[in-house]
Amino acid sequence: MQKTTRTMPAHKHVALVAHDNCKPELLRWVKENKEKLQRHFLYATGTTGHMLSKETGLAIKSMISGPMGGDQQLGALISEGKIDVLVFFWDPLNAVPHDPDVKALLRIASVWNIPVATNRATAKFLFDSPLLEQEVDIEVPDYEAYLAERM
């Protein structure tokens, strides 16, 4: 597939997601990184977003709950270039009914080449990077070329 470049803005669009068993850990991480996070545009699946907003006072655009389609809503935003970073504290030891949606969200994040943090360690590395506060060029699929090949 041909590639093109997309410029991520200095103020990133960050999606925050957590499975139920991981919500307390994400909340703790968000509280620890509130100062950094408030400089960016925040999105989340429904339950996670409402909990984080209530507990931290951060402005978060909440989708619907993950199992009800929120993961897919975030995936659509990623494919439209409207999400720059995904922080997804998922529980690898417990299956959830919407596992196919979870896999699809992680797959689409990889397709569109956005950074993904799946635990505290990767989130720390990502949010301690100076690139978080800078414009960054990333390679993404050239959808126009992809479409032209198929027409």
From Swiss-Prot:
Substrate binds at residues 19, 23, 45-48, 65-66, 98. Keywords: Lyase. Coiled coil: none annotated. The active site is at 71 (proton donor/acceptor). SUPFAM superfamilies: Methylglyoxal synthase-like. Belongs to the methylglyoxal synthase family. Catalyzes the formation of methylglyoxal from dihydroxyacetone phosphate. GO terms for cellular component: cytosol. This is Methylglyoxal synthase. Pfam families: MGS (PF02142). SMART domains: MGS. Its EC number is 4.2.3.3. It catalyses: dihydroxyacetone phosphate = methylglyoxal + phosphate.
